[in-house]
Amino acid sequence: MDKGEEDQDVSHQDLIKQYRKPLETCTNKCFCKKCCYHCQFCFLRKGLGITYHAFRTRRKKIASADRIPVPQQSISIRGRDSQTTQESQKKVEEQAKANLRISRKNLGDETRGPVGAGN
């Protein structure tokens, strides 16, 4: 064997050893391109977003429907005055009638001819 072939065998064995050893943890929190690709661990975790043995935080389970207390008030009472009172309806009607009278007076004061009549 040549010296070059021996070096190649040694380098292949080194690569296999490096492949089999566990990935070293990296404490760098940066997500720039240089930091994402500097090692296999960071590429998997930062570049691809793959994490192993990371437990997800879970929400507490919601109480079942029979345990939820029924509110004593109706929905319309709980809302912020969603139902209009009769007094406020009367005020609105009176204002609308007053505005209608004023606008009709303004229309009568105009001295225009009928629509469609050519001058």
UniProtKB/Swiss-Prot annotation:
GO molecular function: RNA binding; RNA-binding transcription regulator activity
Region (Cysteine-rich): 26-42
Pfam families found in the cross-reference section: Tat (PF00539)
Residue ranges, compositional bias (Polar residues): 71-87
Any Gene Ontology biological process: positive regulation of viral transcription
ATP-binding listed as a keyword: no
GO cellular component terms, semicolon-separated: host cell nucleolus
Subcellular location: Host nucleus, Host nucleolus
Its biological purpose: Transcriptional activator that increases RNA Pol II processivity, thereby increasing the level of full-length viral transcripts. Recognizes a hairpin structure at the 5'-LTR of the nascent viral mRNAs referred to as the transactivation responsive RNA element (TAR) and recruits the cyclin T1-CDK9 complex (P-TEFb complex) that will in turn hyperphosphorylate the RNA polymerase II to allow efficient elongation. The CDK9 component of P-TEFb and other Tat-activated kinases hyperphosphorylate the C-terminus of RNA Pol II that becomes stabilized and much more processive. Extracellular circulating Tat can be endocytosed by surrounding uninfected cells via the binding to several surface receptors. Endosomal low pH allows Tat to cross the endosome membrane to enter the cytosol and eventually further translocate into the nucleus, thereby inducing severe cell dysfunctions ranging from cell activation to cell death. Through.
Protein family membership: Belongs to the lentiviruses Tat family.
Quaternary structure and interacting proteins, as annotated: Interacts with host CCNT1. Associates with the P-TEFb complex composed at least of Tat, P-TEFb (CDK9 and CCNT1), TAR RNA, RNA Pol II. Interacts with CCNT2; the resulting complex is unable to bind to TAR RNA.
Further facts: The 155 isolate is from a monkey imported from Kenya.
Name this protein carries in UniProt: Protein Tat
Gene designation: tat
